[in-house]
């Protein structure tokens, strides 16, 4: 039971590891917001620049 609880906690925390470690934030959708800097994004990956959004205020495969 204790092991199961630890595994559940790890599964809940691991997706946010990049969000915590990367100052650029994690891109998620829908509607597509890059946390914590708030730019729009087109894919569910860590894609925003550490300094914020790119010149199009967007992060994604086409506009990086």
From Swiss-Prot:
It is found in: Secreted. Its main location: secreted. Disulfide bonds: none annotated. One of its GO terms (cellular component) is extracellular region. GO terms for molecular function: toxin activity. Contains 4 disulfide bonds. The keyword Signal applies. It comes from the Eukaryota. Keywords: Disulfide bond, Neurotoxin, Secreted, Signal, Toxin. The keyword Secreted applies. Expressed by the venom duct. Residues 1-21 form the signal peptide. Probable neurotoxin. Belongs to the conotoxin O1 superfamily. The cysteine framework is XII (C-C-C-C-CC-C-C). This is Conotoxin Cal12.4. It comes from Californiconus californicus.
């Amino acid at each position: 039971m204790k092991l199961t609880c630890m595994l559940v906690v790890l599964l809940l925390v691991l997706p946010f590891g990049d969000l915590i470690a990367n100052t650029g934030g994690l891109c998620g959708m829908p509607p597509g917001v890059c946390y914590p800097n708030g730019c729009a994004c087109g894919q569910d990956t860590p894609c925003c620049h550490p300094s914020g959004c790119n010149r199009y205020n967007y992060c994604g495969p086409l506009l990086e």
